[in-house]
């Protein structure tokens, strides 16, 4: 939660019970899946027709929330971090939340973690898929982005106004990670 425009959270006991919502109860479609040895498990958002991977814990701190999921083959940690450090006003004013995924194998298995960030705004979207080369000490990484073609930051007002400007980025420096903007389905 940053401000009334950029404010989503899980309104259920388990992260996979339903989609996250804005404070006004407007659904924000954000989905997370982990494929373990060919079986798809839901861990974030409405599980739809998928099995779920058991949520075994949640840890809330001042700047982050970490959910732990586990089955017989893996332990998955999903960490949402909003760097709201009060001694850095520039950082506090940045409407940005980071989502980190960490998987620990309990036994030998293949896995893929995937997220779908789906726009529900009635607007023309633009996006791209790209690779940033290695630069100095920073490693190379793949990324994708999505945002409205026409943006009016803070151009709306009212009780049920969600953020409708800026860009969503998905990035990973992990070898083999795929970050994709899907224009046809308006999702990352």
Language-model regions, residue ranges each:
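Accessory carbohydrate-recognition regions in carbohydrate-active enzymes
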Residues: 1-188
């Amino acid at each position: 939660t940053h401000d009334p425009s950029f404010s989503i959270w899980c309104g259920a006991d388990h992260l996979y019970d339903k989609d996250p919502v804005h404070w006004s109860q407007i659904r924000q479609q954000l989905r997370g899946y982990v494929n373990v040895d060919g079986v798809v498990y839901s861990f974030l958002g409405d599980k739809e027709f998928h099995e779920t991977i058991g949520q075994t814990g949640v840890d809330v701190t001042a700047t982050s929330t970490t959910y732990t999921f586990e089955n017989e083959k893996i332990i998955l940690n999903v960490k949402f971090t909003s760097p709201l450090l009060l001694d850095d006003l520039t950082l506090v004013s940045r409407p940005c939340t980071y989502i980190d995924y960490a998987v620990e194998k309990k036994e030998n298995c293949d896995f893929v973690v995937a997220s779908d960030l789906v726009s529900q705004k009635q607007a023309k979207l633009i996006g791209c898929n790209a690779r940033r080369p290695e630069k100095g000490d920073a490693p190379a990484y793949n990324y994708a982005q999505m945002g409205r073609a026409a943006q009016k930051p803070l151009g709306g007002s009212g009780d049920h106004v969600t953020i409708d400007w800026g860009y969503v980025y998905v990035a990973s420096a992990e070898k083999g990670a795929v970050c994709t903007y899907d224009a046809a389905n308006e999702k990352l």
